[in-house]
Amino acid sequence: MPKEKYDPPDPRRLYTIMSAEEVASGKKSHWTELEISGRVRSLSSSLWTLTHLTALHINNNNLSRIPPEIAKLPHLVYLNLSSNKLRSLPAELGNMVTLRELLLNNNCLRVLPYELGRLFQLQTLGLKGNPLSQDILNLYQEPDGTRKLLNYMLDNLAVHPEQLPQRPWITLRERDQMMPTAVFTVMCYNVLCDKYATRQLYGYCPSWALNWEYRKKGIMEEITNCDADIISLQEVETEQYYTFFLETLKDRGYDGFFCPKSRAKLVSEQERKHVDGCGVFFKTEKFALVQKHTVEFNQVAMANSEGSEVMLNRVMTKDNIGVAVLLEVKKDLFATGLKPPPEKQLLLVANAHMHWDPEYSDVKLIQTMMFLSELKSIAERASGSINSSSPTSETSSIPIVLCADLNSLPDSGVVEYLSNGGVAENHKDFKELRYSDCLTNFSCNGKNGKPDGSITHSFQLKSAYEGNLMPYTNYTYDFKGVIDYIFFSKTHMSVLGVLGPLETQWLKDNNITGCPHPHIPSDHFSLLAQLEYHPPLPPLNGLHLPVHSTACESKMLTE
């Protein structure tokens, strides 16, 4: 059902005629409704150029057909075709998904195109006075008959095309042949939890294609086709993690770690099975698990509220979580050439799903700050205790890969914070709420802060998908944009290539107004990046070289 309130056109259709003075002064006319009457038999093709129309009244005429070009009026919410001589309707009528009211009363219609089922925002469908089949009329005359009839037609509409085109692989740079680097792939994918996949949210998708038993096959096919070395998933239902994802991926050589959202602690055992969370999987032939961690944002918020009411009332009430696994990179993953350093090569892989509501940009930003603050503590402890031979126990000594559904656009404070290493404490995304007293708890500068009043983190991160490589990661009728990300430590890693987007024109040509779709099992597209890890170089004459060495340094080390 549509989310916005619909007000039908005023039947009186009041209008005002501009005076000669108004015309002379250059005043522009504005009209969005059109009525055509007079027992008209055919329609002029110039009608389809009036793309600004929101209401079209062509009832009480002698029209026997409606041309498919009517779908060129993309803003129509009201269409009255009643009391004509229509015997059929064009299938293209189903592309007019903005329609809220479609009146077809008193015509000669015996059948309806199943494409009408795609009109998921339609509230009123007038069919009285047509010689339709009894099955259609019976369904239409039931309580909430319009909705039931549209659902029936959508569920029985033939699906085209039969398969998706391949997404392109975008090569960004070549592997460093001079150094013993490790190359691996990382996937980030929000799989759309079953309980969120409702017809209320995704009315444009057939009910059978929203069903989890159908969608999970497409989701696993997407995962296995990508064959990533590290997989980060969001919106994984607890029961499905253990009975489906872990079970299936273990057979393919993965191990995994999962944690549900914090509300799992507060519900019954039966309800707990359906709480979603975040999971990380990794190929055991390439990585070994060292540590695993869960970060509950509401608990971190409570511990750092500093008496802040907005922290308690806005941040602590959200049950989002993040997970992290500390992995050892196995030596076989490194290319031949220089031997990798004898010390353990560690990698911190983090995965999170931030709060969804656009009105809570402050919460998303603080959740991100809390997550990086906790990751900093994890990295510092790991660097000091496990890799004590490292020249430093600083956070930056352990590289990080951060995958997340941030529910934030590229121009948001969240992405600015991650990409630039900090954000101003008076950033607009804080909504002028009083967080300043507790924000410094999450800054790498601690209570001292920075002179410019910014909140910083100590990870030097870069997005694998920079620029416009991916125009959208979330693709629904109401929203199309980038909210999913893969970040990595740019001091230790570089990105060699990424999986590109599904062609926008293909989606338009096939009238895919949003996902999920019978061929696209989630409302998100997966991200896949190939990363190259440059381990620290062994000391040269007692000096520790930078991670990214020059070719000259490489030559010196091989001699």
Swiss-Prot record:
Q: Which residues bind Mg(2+) 1?
A: E235
> What EC number is given for this enzyme?
3.1.13.4
Free-text comment on the cofactor: Binds 2 magnesium ions, but the ions interact each with only 1 or 2 residues.
> Where is the segment annotated Required for interaction with cnot1, cnot3 and cnot7?
1-148
Question: Where's it found, cell-wise?
Answer: Cytoplasm; Nucleus
Positions binding Mg(2+) 2 in this chain are: D405
Q: Which residues does the Swiss-Prot or TrEMBL record annotate as the active site?
A: D405
Q: Which GO terms describe its molecular function?
A: 3'-5'-RNA exonuclease activity; metal ion binding; poly(A)-specific ribonuclease activity
A GO biological process of this protein is: regulatory ncRNA-mediated gene silencing
Tell me the cofactors it needs. Answer: Mg(2+)
Q: Which domain of life is it from?
A: Eukaryota
**Cysteine disulfide links:** none
Keywords in UniProt for this one?
Answer: Cytoplasm, Exonuclease, Hydrolase, Leucine-rich repeat, Magnesium, Metal-binding, mRNA processing, Nuclease, Nucleus, Repeat, RNA-mediated gene silencing, Transcription, Transcription regulation, Translation regulation
InterPro entries for this protein = CCR4/nocturin_mRNA_transcr (IPR050410), Endo/exonu/phosph_ase_sf (IPR036691), Endo/exonuclease/phosphatase (IPR005135), Leu-rich_rpt (IPR001611), Leu-rich_rpt_typical-subtyp (IPR003591), LRR_dom_sf (IPR032675)
Cellular component GO terms held in the UniProt record: CCR4-NOT complex; cytoplasm; nucleus
Query: Which family does the record claim for this protein?
Result: Belongs to the CCR4/nocturin family.
Q: Can you state the subunit structure given in the record?
A: Component of the CCR4-NOT complex.
What protein am I looking at?
CCR4-NOT transcription complex subunit 6-like
- The species this protein was found in: Danio rerio (Zebrafish)
> What taxonomic classification does the UniProt entry list for its organism?
Eukaryota, Metazoa, Chordata, Craniata, Vertebrata
